[in-house]
Regions:
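C-terminal region of N-terminal signal peptides and the immediate post-cleavage residues
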Residues: 9-32
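N-terminal export and membrane-targeting signals
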Residues: 1-6
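Short, ordered "entry" segments at domain starts
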Residues: 26-73, 77-82, 87, 110-111, ...
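Feature marks extracellular polysaccharide-active and adherence modules
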Residues: 49, 55, 63, 69, ...
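Short, low-complexity, Pro/Ser/Thr/Gly-rich segments in the mature regions of secreted, periplasmic
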Residues: 22-27, 238-252
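Acidic/polar low-complexity surface segments
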Residues: 94-122, 150-163, 183, 195-207, ...
């Protein structure tokens, strides 16, 4: 067990992304959204400070970073849009972060249809890291992240947390998340998946806990302290894992 935690700790220390600073280039200016749709256009950095959305068919290019401030909302999972972020995405405590939507006909599985246009699909890419800290809800569906996805803490309430149908070049790490449901499904992940201290309060009879289903994982899958209503709970099947399965996920 100690060896498992040592491996997980080494992975997290070696790959945890730093918070984004200023960046980008060109003549575009930065943009702060305090509510409503983010207009199509090119921006240096984007700061989300209120309940912000994207319109169906919008095309947004960000040459730097996106920051979702405390208690703010970035809903880019309800309407199909094209969003290109050159650097990092960071969501702060109490924020809502939803990126990506597609119909089942596009993904070949249950997918995450766009509420505004159920047959439409988004195209969202992040050139750096995606990091959340104490975020209320995270929904990542069919996006591309070049480096790492790190979900540190958070209380999701009744909204499920999903990491689904994504292409992630680095590691996926989720630690200290409290939610009704948490799933890592149908992803292509270049390096490791580390899941630890995820507590679910799913009251459905026979709730199986954290879902880890049909992922392609380039290195290792490491799990510990995954619970549903205080009882150990994890369900995994159909995964292609190039490395080892360790801890609570051994043998998945």
């Amino acid at each position: 067990v100690l060896a498992i935690f040592a491996v997980a700790g080494a992975l997290m220390l070696g790959t945890a992304p730093a918070y984004a600073g200023g960046g980008g280039g060109g003549s575009s200016s930065s943009y702060t959204c305090k509510g409503g749709d983010i207009p199509s256009g090119t921006y240096k950095n984007v700061t989300i400070s209120g309940p912000c959305t994207v319109a169906a068919g919008s095309v947004i290019t960000i040459t730097g970073n996106v920051i979702v401030n405390k208690g703010a909302m970035l809903d880019a999972q309800s309407a199909p849009a094209t969003i290109t972020i050159a650097q990092n995405v960071t969501a702060l405590p109490g924020a809502f972060l939803g990126l990506g939507c597609q119909p089942p006909s596009y993904t070949g599985n249950s997918a995450h249809p766009c509420a505004v246009d159920p047959e439409g699909h988004s195209s969202i890419s992040v050139g750096g890291n995606l990091t959340t800290a104490g975020t209320s809800t995270v929904m990542l569906n069919g996006i591309t992240v070049a480096r790492n996805v790190t979900l540190a803490g958070g209380n999701g309430g009744p909204i499920p947390w999903s990491v689904k149908n994504n292409k992630i070049g680095g590691n996926v790490t989720a630690i200290g998340v409290n939610a009704s449901w948490f799933g890592v499904l149908f992803n292509e992940i270049g390096k490791n998946v580390v899941l630890s201290h995820i507590a679910l309060d799913d009251h459905d009879p026979g709730a199986p806990g954290v879902y880890i289903v049909r992922n392609k994982i380039g290195q290792n899958l490491i799990c510990s302290n995954l619970t549903v209503l205080g009882v150990a709970g994890v369900t995994g099947y159909g995964n292609a894992i190039s490395g080892k399965t360790l801890g609570q996920c051994a043998g998945i």
